[in-house]
Amino acid sequence: MATKIGIISDPHATPGPVEEALSIFRQEGVERILCAGDIAGYGDSLDETVALLAAHGCQSVIGNHEAWYLDRTIGRGESLTYRYLSGLPLSLKMEVEGKVLYMVHASPPDSLMDGIRLLDEQGELVDRQLIYWTDRLQGLTYDLLVVGHTHQVFAESMAATLVINPGSTLCNHSCAVVNFPALQVHWYSLSSQPLLKSWNWGMNRL
């Protein structure tokens, strides 16, 4: 029987799109929810976003914005936000329906900044980038690699691994559901906005 996993990334302290993604996941009957990091940054509702993710049992990895937040808030360990973010791992590995899934914010094994960027400004695949990252990811033993960070939406096979970036719930207006063991990816748009495949050129694009 198929298992569904809901995947989000880069909510950037903005709970509205996250809440919408969680509603989609409930409707789709997902069994697990993953977030590829950058819960913090840009937005002004970090506490609400963290509370929402925690209440729904979302498993997340740390992103660069969480690392920066924790550096600025040393000693504030009593808040739910601090406890949640400080407990996030650099990476997450699990087996689902016989498939090995690995999640990291930017790129494996544990980078927070070296993001997998495959698309141009129009959201078109850049062949040289695909070749570059396919070469870099040779030797991975994962069936599915989940990343975030670059605010790009893609699912591309590289070497023996399917690499998925669900995009930012805030910037790309996107989330994904993956069916296991077939590794079929279904995309969903958020905030009554079209899904924006590539967003890297300024907050005025929101």
Regions found by a protein language model. Give the residues of each.
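Beta-strand-turn-beta hairpins that frame and shape the catalytic cleft
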Residues: 1-6, 93-102, 158-163, 183-184
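Core catalytic region of metal-dependent phosphoesterases/phosphodiesterases
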Residues: 2-95
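Active-site environment of divalent metal-dependent phosphoester hydrolases
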Residues: 12-17, 41-44, 66-71, 109-111, ...
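Short amphipathic alpha-helical segments
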Residues: 19-20, 46-48, 73-74, 115-116, ...
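A short helix->loop->beta-strand "cap" motif at the edges of active sites that frequently abuts
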Residues: 56-58, 142, 161
